[in-house]
């Protein structure tokens, strides 16, 4: 089914949720209708078949942990949370020789502006995430796992807890899963809405009951993670992709996408599009196709710019974005990041100064305050952009923004500082003329003499 056929189907049904026919070859959203999230529904969609295959239940030999890791490596699955690190390689970092407790953690702290895919996964397909985490635990020899869920989606947290109870009752979780001798305990944990807890080490601090602030790295979580033990953290969508890979093989997953960018990816389309929502398409899909699935730019207006991977990714002007395919390598070559897959579309009515002002305020508000460049610099960025937007900008402000961004980027413990600095630099690179025009207008108003009350009366009298 091509994009136009999918769109026609959507328009005919009038469906307004993510349970639409606008996906292309879906693997994660396939068969969902918003009500069929329970265990019996998931099993009807081949749910837990990958787990049974891995454990050798129902015929065939059990896979070894090394075989599971090798299959995930072959799939070219890359982390879906933002960094795009190869998942199989990350799993291989878990020390095999370590005999103490080891942990696997799911990062469902979805706080990136524009991103809403993980929420839908946990709400409407929670068992796929659970199965993926069980497989990961088997591959890495871990016995306990946690899913850290964003604190502002408490209903989703409750839904995931219900799914966990179903999985435990059916023998998919516990000390002896399906009689295999393999045991894994999985727990849900909710945060309190802090954006910084999406950073993996801040997340681990929060799970431990501490203030959510990033740790210095190294040591990395694979050697010193939760409670000081080896830990692997992956994104919700990453875990959700694993069951399909184990059922069908790594090679089949690569063929669903493109080399070095295997499988499908969920994109959260928002901004100036007719049909905002989540879309699952193969990696490497042209951006134009994705935009078409979302109904195109609203009211038929002209595309101006796109933020392709959530608010922390650099903005790209329309011409660069339309030449991209939706995968890590293509977006990086264009000068941005695929990130979490949160695609924010901007039409030709958007003021880029105002857009940057909103982004800068978010990062100033969400800085944990641990690092001086981020704590002080994000405030400076917002205040300067706010000054320009309010008509009080000075020509030197643009150099000041560049200087502050330079003093933040690469100088903080975590990437929040980079996330605040990169949008500023990208906006100034591609849309500097808008900032200059606003500053020039402010200067013109400042330099234009204002007549006093008496001068206005005298002038009017002479004119009469």
Where is each model-derived feature located?
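Ferredoxin-type iron-sulfur electron-transfer modules in oxidoreductases and energy-metabolism complexes
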Residues: 1, 49-74, 100-104, 108, ...
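Cofactor-/ligand-binding subdomain signature composed of acidic, glycine-rich
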Residues: 2-69
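Gly-rich Lys/Arg/Thr-decorated short loops/hinges at beta-loop-alpha junctions or inter-strand turns
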Residues: 34, 42-49, 106-118, 221-227, ...
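Conserved phosphate/anionic-ligand binding catalytic regions in large, soluble enzymes, centered on
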Residues: 47, 72-94, 136, 191-205, ...
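Accessory "access/gating" subregions that flank catalytic or transport cores
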Residues: 54-97, 255, 260, 268, ...
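Short amphipathic, charge-patterned alpha-helical segments
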Residues: 132-136, 282-300
